[in-house]
Amino acid sequence: MRKYLTVAALGILLTGCGEKSDFEKAINEKISKNGVCYGFSKENNAKVVEDFRLGTPVRVNIYGRDDVDPVLIGLKNTGFLNISYEQEMFKRVAILETTDKGRNTKFWDSNNGACVGHRAVAEVKSWTEPSEGNGVKMTQVTYTWRLDGVPGWVDKKAFSGVKGMVEPEETKIVLVKTNNGWAAR
């Protein structure tokens, strides 16, 4: 009898682990697709990007209340960029210029800009019991993520303002059960 109870308990335990790893896989498929990057808007052409990489200053509009993206702050803190500001009528403009150190490091990718890694699940912390709703089976998962694939030129202390660089960030996501397993929506 003890043998059967031990096998049953082990089966239940392994089922929970399987679900947890399935959740992690589904979340990673969603959150790791795009890098954590700073780039120019799509209207800037290849010539502007190449000139910037060679040291020509580029003017970038700053929208909203935030002064500057945390990736830009990290690039400035590392000594790869000089950033100055001007006010133009009703908008603020940042003037970005690569330094000698920045040009030698080649931190800028012409397609994506400066990327400091991508999000990856650090830990699946908890989830709701999967339930039916609107004809689908779903669950809400609480997890932490951190930056993964961080390039060698990134000084984590200089980029500490970028979420997930130093400490994992906690968030929630809804997963839906499909014929191919769990998927993030």
Which residues does each PLM region occupy?
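Sec-dependent signal peptide recognition
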Residues: 2-8
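C-terminal motif of bacterial Sec signal peptides marking the signal peptidase cleavage site
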Residues: 14-16
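Bacterial lipoprotein signal-peptidase II cleavage site
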Residues: 18-23
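Post-signal-peptide N-terminal segment of Sec-exported extracytoplasmic proteins
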Residues: 35-67
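Basic amphipathic alpha-helical segments that dock to polyanions
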Residues: 64-82
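Accessory beta->alpha helical hairpin/"wing" motif in late/C-terminal subdomains of nucleic-acid enzymes
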Residues: 78, 82-121, 128-130
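Short beta-strand edge/turn micro-motifs at domain boundaries
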Residues: 82, 140-147, 164-185
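Short, cysteine-centered beta-strand-loop-beta hairpins and adjacent loop/turn segments enriched
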Residues: 101, 144-166
